[in-house]
């Protein structure tokens, strides 16, 4: 049954779950509730029919997310710095870069201003500081790959860098670090140009249908399009 959930870091939009099961009365009720709570609505949609249904009711397509898996094979990479070995000042720089990256890629649904990014990263027990790596140039971070452990798998959460070439080079190095035979799961969003370059450059395997993020702004003139 479709429900509304709210991300505490991005409370401007409530997310619709089980969006493919939506009917018109339920959607109207959700739009009315969101308007009352001064929120917009958002949904991740895989099926074209559902995309059309939501578009007919005032939703706009914002981005597309791809779900992928990279199989790690034998590869000799270049030396890099694991996050676990960073000094305190470089960890602080990494947190600042993560904040800038997250805000830049969430302009349609901006996060609240007081997120503790250090706690979000280093305070998460699933953060894998050993397999997460950065590239340093003149003692500054120019590219990063941040990996988490989830259900006995490695999972990419964020990756960013100064430019495409630098980031892709770091990814080639990563292939020489991850255990041979392991699998790296990831999602890639079209709002993140640098990460999408990684998705397009390496041989990722699709693990689920791509999803389109659709949003209904609370400032919409009508609850529904007639």
Write out the residue ranges for each language-model feature.
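A conserved beta-strand-loop-helix scaffold within acyl/acetyltransferase catalytic domains
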Residues: 2-13, 106-159
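A short, internal acetyl-CoA/4′-phosphopantetheine-binding micro-motif in the GNAT/acyltransferase core
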Residues: 8-27, 157-167
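Acyl-donor-binding surface of acyltransferase catalytic domains
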Residues: 19-81, 183-221
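A generic secondary-structure signal
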Residues: 30-33, 120-124, 173-177
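A short beta-loop-alpha structural element at the N-terminal edge
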Residues: 81-98, 105-107
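Residues within well-ordered alpha-helical secondary structure of globular protein domains
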Residues: 97-100, 201
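Aromatic (often tryptophan-rich) hydrophobic motifs at membrane interfaces
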Residues: 144, 149-210
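C-terminal helical cap(s) of enzyme catalytic domains, especially alpha/beta-barrels
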Residues: 223-225
